[in-house]
Amino acid sequence: SIIKAIKDTVVYLDEINTISEAVISEAVGIRLIEQILNNFYLYYRSMFQNPLHKKATMSMDELKKIQIGNEYDLQRMLYALLVPIFPLIRQEVESDNGYGGMRADLYLEEYDLIIETKCTRASMTEKKLLEELGADGFYYKAKTVFFFVYDKKSIIKNPDVFKAAFVREQEKNGKNIKVIVLQPVEL
């Protein structure tokens, strides 16, 4: 009946309105971001390395031109992945640490969360990377800091030990720090 259809439509519209107004809680938002960072390699492989459909207008040659050359390329890709889910995320946000300025690669104010991207290069040593992350971890005032390291030059000898060296928890250290290391593997 028409009355039932109208009632069903009103219920449906109410549900859409409720969904559109839904806010992602801080815990869920942080977990989503962590999941995206941990699985970034799946996105990269699916987008740039997996075979294309035969009717696709893109070519593998075109896709192979898109590479992660440095941390700015990595930052752009992460931003593009995160902005549809977290539209308030911002890039290159300046802040004052009390002595000098700091610039967060990606910042999500609603969770007081920073994502700092690092991309290793031939001239970088593991010690230099440790020093950079240590300084950033100390100076960033955000409640949650993710370090996303794309170790394309495989300078990190033991990623698990490397990550464990930086993990901090809010209750003990006043902020959450997590490190995600992605080392490309070609067989």
Where are these regions (language model features)?
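Conserved catalytic cores of phosphodiester-cleaving nucleases, focusing on short active-site segments
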Residues: 106-108, 112-122
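Long, charged, glycine-rich C-terminal linkers/tails
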Residues: 58-61, 67, 89-109, 180-184
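Internal, Lys/Arg-enriched amphipathic helical interaction segments that engage polyanionic partners
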Residues: 1-32
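Nuclease catalytic cores
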Residues: 29-34, 38, 67-71, 75
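Catalytic cores of nucleic-acid endonucleases
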Residues: 119-169
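Hydrophobic beta-strand segments of well-ordered beta-sheets in folded domains
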Residues: 111-113, 143-150, 177-179
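Acidic-basic catalytic patches of nuclease active cores, encompassing PD-(D/E)XK
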Residues: 43-91
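Domain-level recognition of nuclease-like catalytic cores that cleave nucleotide substrates
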Residues: 2-8, 152-187
